[in-house]
Design a protein with these regions (language model features):
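Short acidic-hydrophobic, aromatic-tinged amphipathic segments that line or gate anion-handling sites
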Residues: 106-111, 159-172
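Active-site neighborhood of HAD-like aspartate-dependent phosphohydrolases
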Residues: 1-50
Length: 181
């Protein structure tokens, strides 16, 4: 099976990393968990994004509970590709943050190329994604999608994908997809 996973918001807690960054740098910020994209909705978002990405914050994001262990178990049995909307110049920091994960490939492709990279290049059997518009796009492309339901902004995505609440549920979801397809 070819498995592809997003990174931020799925494997790594980018949201909490950004909140910690704003607190440490004394940047006023109020997070709205109903909206996707902690930086996207920020005033002067490109400047703040560049500041966040230029430091060590990006290479020190915390893993969601169980994500590393489950991904390594999956990687021992399947192809595991990681794709992130981070720009290619952030590849080194992202690889540093993910050094404990045994993935097949890591793609830092930028926001504009993520959908194309997944659908046309990787062509996974299953995609793990949290961005609502990409969940829908991958579903329309015929890719089975599962998503973490711990983000309020993924509410309603059950129409297009299968939710999971804990990473230890993922192997069973993938096994069930093999037996039902």
């Amino acid at each position: 099976m070819i498995i592809c996973s997003d990174v931020d918001g799925v494997i790594l807690n980018y949201i909490q990393g950004f909140i910690d960054f704003t607190r440490k740098e004394k940047i006023p910020y109020s997070h709205n968990p109903e909206l996707y994209g902690v930086i996207r909705n920020f005033p002067d978002n490109l400047e703040v994004r560049d500041q966040f990405h230029s430091g060590e914050y990006l290479s020190q994001l915390k893993f969601y509970d169980g994500s590393m262990e489950i991904l390594n178990m999956l990687a021992s049995k399947h192809e595991l590709h990681l794709v992130t909307a981070l720009e290619p110049e952030q590849s080194k920091k992202r690889a540093e943050n993910l050094k404990m994960v045994n993935y097949t490939t890591l793609h830092c492709v930028g926001d504009d190329r993520k959908e194309e990279t997944v659908v046309e290049e990787i062509q996974p059997d299953v995609m793990i994604e949290d961005r609502p518009e990409l969940i829908e796009a991958f579903h329309r492309a015929g890719i089975r999608v599962i998503f973490p339901d711990w983000h309020p902004y993924t509410k309603g995505m059950e129409r297009f994908a299968t939710p999971f609440s804990l990473w230890n549920e993922v192997p069973d979801l993938l096994h069930n997809s093999l037996t039902t397809d």
